[in-house]
């Protein structure tokens, strides 16, 4: 792992063009909630107000912050956690070479240079989940923070968490994370998957992907590493992550038994859960709904079982002809989760991997089991969200949302797309964003991004950016459709800037200012083009917005309403046409 950050990397972490990091003071001393403020230029001397938008970039876009990845980022939640008086520090488990998939610990890659902290856990008999606090009428500092980010009342946040309609993923060992909420009555969130594989990527690359993804708007990160250095990669990511981090613990557990699924045991898996909870993982994808009796149903599918976690557990169940140990030990898993406030992301191990398999018996059988497990988790006051498909044609998407809300008692839905067609490898960020926008509108709380590399390879930095931006579009479109009270403000500001030919404001208000300016400047690179009343699409003579301005100006000069001006202008042009001989071409 590189021990320093280059000037180029620091530049990449600067704020987006035309923006600056601002902070809103919270109700308690020292609480500062980050926002991104987009400046706007005046319109004929009349000021246009700055637009504040949700910010996930962490301290990296604060010019006062010095980036030192080897030290990690600030820990704003640490004092809040300790003040509640229900946690204790302890030695924790010893980091073993097999945690990183090796037999001998590496001498070159420290787990983390600043590893002087002890993990926290709940005191004997205590429950430290945000759901437990909410159900006991307590509005935590995390809930107050979230309320400011979302523009809602803290009591509303508490109630949504208490009722299970939202989760606030916030492991007590990840104090670096800026609190956020996932629920259908809040902004639709976007998750970005990162992680190495056995054949590609390094620790440094994955940390950079994390900071890159959050810069472009990823609300959470999932580390899906399956290669070497799993533990170390995760430690570096968590210590530098301003957003919640999720994992699929079965991946690392499998590495510990040399990739042989049938050698997995509950003991190995349990040890992995504790290892990751001590590091600070905020939510676990756990495929406890893949039951032995469901596996034969998948035999008639076009694409069988496509979930990695689902296929691992199916293989274990068939080899031993026993029930899924994640299901049989679920109560014990809940006991671990509530000691650290790790949220469940109940995995859809039998999700459809093709349009042909959408909404089939296997998929919905597993969903019924996830509903059952949700009730058990809630009995322990453990937070839960439900993972969803997958590959689903547009006319079958709504049924997924309706069934999830009914079967899982309104727990937040977290979906991978869904992809609405199977014919576009290389463009599956688009095929899935169509489904993501729809299911977000119907009520999904968080969308898992898909990159152009889906089904083809491990995404690089550019793919991560493309995936995040594509899914921010889908999430925002869903917020607009749901009538979120602040969603339209940015659209209205950009539309006004567009009509007034304020090109730089158009770029800066967009989700990807750099891309917008790049495309504009391909054909009109001159600085004067930034104030021109046309673009290269229509040119100066055929710009519809310029013509609209001319009509308005004509109406103003002749003291007419706009519709009257159009009618009068038409009559004058008709008269002129006749007077010049009624020739079509002059």
UniProtKB/Swiss-Prot annotation:
According to the UniProt entry, what is the EC number of this protein?
A: 4.1.99.17
The cofactors required by this protein are:
[4Fe-4S] cluster
Q: Which residues bind Zn(2+)?
A: 391, 455
Query: What reaction does this enzyme carry out catalytically?
Result: 5-amino-1-(5-phospho-beta-D-ribosyl)imidazole + S-adenosyl-L-methionine = 4-amino-2-methyl-5-(phosphooxymethyl)pyrimidine + CO + 5'-deoxyadenosine + formate + L-methionine + 3 H(+)
- List the InterPro entries hit by this protein, alphabetically: ThiC, ThiC-associated_dom, ThiC/Bza_core_dom, ThiC/BzaA/B
Keyword Iron-sulfur applies:
yes
The UniProt similarity line reads:
Belongs to the ThiC family.
Q: What is the native source organism of this protein?
A: Bacillus cereus (strain AH820)
Binding residue positions for substrate: 193, 222, 251, 287, 307-309, 348-351, 387, 414
Q: Which PANTHER family match?
A: PHOSPHOMETHYLPYRIMIDINE SYNTHASE, CHLOROPLASTIC, THIAMINE BIOSYNTHESIS PROTEIN THIC
**Which pathway does this chain act in?**
Cofactor biosynthesis; thiamine diphosphate biosynthesis
In its UniProt record, which GO terms are filed under biological process?
thiamine biosynthetic process; thiamine diphosphate biosynthetic process
Q: What is this protein called?
A: Phosphomethylpyrimidine synthase
The entry's [4Fe-4S] cluster-binding residues are: 535, 538, 543
Q: Spell out the molecular function terms from Gene Ontology.
A: 4 iron, 4 sulfur cluster binding; carbon-carbon lyase activity; zinc ion binding
> Which key words tag this protein in UniProt?
4Fe-4S, Iron, Iron-sulfur, Lyase, Metal-binding, S-adenosyl-L-methionine, Thiamine biosynthesis, Zinc
Instruction: Give positions of region: Disordered.
Output: 1-59
Q: Where is composition skewed (Basic and acidic residues) in this entry? A: 22-39
> What's the record's note on cofactor binding?
Binds 1 [4Fe-4S] cluster per subunit. The cluster is coordinated with 3 cysteines and an exchangeable S-adenosyl-L-methionine.
- Keyword tRNA-binding carried by entry: no
């Amino acid at each position: 792992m590189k021990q320093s950050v280059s000037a180029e990397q620091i530049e990449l972490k600067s704020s987006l063009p035309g923006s600056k990091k601002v902070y809103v003071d919270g109700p308690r001393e020292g609480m500062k909630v980050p926002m991104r403020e987009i400046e706007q230029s005046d319109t004929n001397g009349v000021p246009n107000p700055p637009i504040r938008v949700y910010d996930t970039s962490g301290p990296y876009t604060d010019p006062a912050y010095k980036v030192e990845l080897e030290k990690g980022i600030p820990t704003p939640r640490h004092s809040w956690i300790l003040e509640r008086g229900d946690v204790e520090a302890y030695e924790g488990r010893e980091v073993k070479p097999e945690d990183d998939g090796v037999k001998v610990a590496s001498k070159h890659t420290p787990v983390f240079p600043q590893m002087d902290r002890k993990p926290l856990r709940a005191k004997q008999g205590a429950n430290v989940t945000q759901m437990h606090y909410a159900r006991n009428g307590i509005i935590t500092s995390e809930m107050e923070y979230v309320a400011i980010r979302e523009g809602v009342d803290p009591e509303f946040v508490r109630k949504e968490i208490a009722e299970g309609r939202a989760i606030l993923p916030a492991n007590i060992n990840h104090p670096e994370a800026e609190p956020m909420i996932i629920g259908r009555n809040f902004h639709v969130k976007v998750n970005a998957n990162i992680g190495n594989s056995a054949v590609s990527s390094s620790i440094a690359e994955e940390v950079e992907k994390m900071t890159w993804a959050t810069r472009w708007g990823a609300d959470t990160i999932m580390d899906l590493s399956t290669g070497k250095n799993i533990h170390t990669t995760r430690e570096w990511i968590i210590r530098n992550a301003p957003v919640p981090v999720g994992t699929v613990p079965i991946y690392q557990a499998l590495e510990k038994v040399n990739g042989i699924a049938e050698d997995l045991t509950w003991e190995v898996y349990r040890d992995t859960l504790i290892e990751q909870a001590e590091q600070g993982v905020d939510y676990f994808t756990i495929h406890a709904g893949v039951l032995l009796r469901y596996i034969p149903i998948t035999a008639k599918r076009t694409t069988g079982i496509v979930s990695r976690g689902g296929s691992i557990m199916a293989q274990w169940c068939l080899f031993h002809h026993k029930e899924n140990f994640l299901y049989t030990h679920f109560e014990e898993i809940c006991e671990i989760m509530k000691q650290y406030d790790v949220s469940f992301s109940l995995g859809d191990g039998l999700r459809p991997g093709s349009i042909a398999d959408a909404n089939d018996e296997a998929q919905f059988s597993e969903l019924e089991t996830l509903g059952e497990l949700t009730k058990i988790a809630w009995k322990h006051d453990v937070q839960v969200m439900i993972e969803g498909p997958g590959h689903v044609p547009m006319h079958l998407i709504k049924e997924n949302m309706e069934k999830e809300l009914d079967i899982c008692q309104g727990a937040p839905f977290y979906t991978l797309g869904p992809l609405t067609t199977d014919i576009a490898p290389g463009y599956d960020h688009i095929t899935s964003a169509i489904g993501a926008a729809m299911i977000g509108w119907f009520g999904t709380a968080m969308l898992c991004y898909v990159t152009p590399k889906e089904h083809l390879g491990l995404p690089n930095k550019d793919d991560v950016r493309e995936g995040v931006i594509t899914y921010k579009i889908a999430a925002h479109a869903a917020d607009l459709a749901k009538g979120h009270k602040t969603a339209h403000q940015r659209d209205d500001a950009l539309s006004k800037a567009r009509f007034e030919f304020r090109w730089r404001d158009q770029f800066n208000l967009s989700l990807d200012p750099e891309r917008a300016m790049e495309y504009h400047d391909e054909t009109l690179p001159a600085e004067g083009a930034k104030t021109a009343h046309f673009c290269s699409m229509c040119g100066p003579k055929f710009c519809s917005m310029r013509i609209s301005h001319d009509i308005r100006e004509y109406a103003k000069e002749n003291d007419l309403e706009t519709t009257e001006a159009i009618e009068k202008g038409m009559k004058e042009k008709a008269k002129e046409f006749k007077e010049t001989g009624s020739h079509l071409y002059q």
